[in-house]
Amino acid sequence: MNVSSSRSVLPTAAAVVTVLLWASAFVAIRAAGDAYSPGALALGRMLAGSVALGALCLLRREGWPPRAAWRGILISGVLWFGFYMVVLNWGERQVDAGTAALVVNVGPLLIALLGARLLGDPMPPRLLAGMAVSFAGAVVVGLSMSSGGGGSSVLGVVLCLLAAVAYAGGVVSQKPALGSASALQVTTFGCLVGAVCCLPFAGQLVTEASRAPLTATLDMVYLGVFPTALAFTTWAYALARTTASRMGATTYAVPALVVLLSWLVLDEVPRPFTLVGGVLCLAGVAVSRSRARARVVRVGAAAGPEGEPVVEPVAGPVTEPVAGPVAGPVVERRPEEV
């Protein structure tokens, strides 16, 4: 594998690892949620993640992030690692799983809007179309998983919506920090900030941990080490190499994977409409991450100045003519995107 293909494959692999582990987090949260309250679970998860990330930072001798990165680290740490974790755990106790999945999946749409407004992210038609298809799939998944018995409270819906807003704000604020600090630094110190925000729940964590079954505690540790420490680092690595909008659209694969993991791990057989929604989610991600091909128009007698081939500008990879005869080859350069 050459250097250029490796630079393209690694961010894609990082994004895949992220969505797989984040999907597994929903299963683990359900397993640990019976023994731990929302705040205690969030604090335990952040502490486990901070220990794992801190050890990795020491091994790699990463050091402190540059001053320019701290604003983004602090904001994303408070919003995403702190506030989001608590309100999501709390909201999932107030509404059924389908309603929670439906409301939280407003997040990627908010990321696209905030990314375009605050970061100047481009909004190509393929990205918009893919997000529309994925959101439709998330709606189908949410409605098919909803209990329909009126068990979803207004408070629960508001909490899940706040989680989506915090998620979007955390992603958009994290992106600039990755311009001056490494993915590991941004994730480690963001996780530490989140742990500090959750410290008011320390008393609950100590009390509940003393009587919680070992399996629930192991689920909490798993949440900290894998969906937090590892997945947030691979997320930051991929985010540093593409736009916030594009990465946000990628997370629409999570509902489909949650359905699959619930089927395999919890023996919850999905309904036909749930499977259809999952397929739509994945199809939308594929569309949003696809790129249009460049078209190179060669005109014999009507060649450009100095006998160069005429290149028709279109959206997609950049093409550059190579000096040489009129019929010479064209080298295609693709931007390093996930």
Place the predicted regions along the sequence by residue.
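Specific transmembrane alpha-helical segments of multi-pass solute transporters/efflux pumps
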Residues: 21, 25-29, 54-104, 140, ...
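Transmembrane alpha-helical segments that form core, pore/gating elements
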Residues: 53, 111-113, 117, 131, ...
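Helix-helix packing/entry segments at the starts of transmembrane helices
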Residues: 43-44, 99-106, 173-196, 224-264
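Transmembrane alpha-helices of multi-pass small-molecule transport proteins
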Residues: 34-83, 108-110, 114, 165-173, ...
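Hydrophobic transmembrane alpha-helices of multi-pass small-molecule transport proteins
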Residues: 53, 74, 114, 123-145, ...
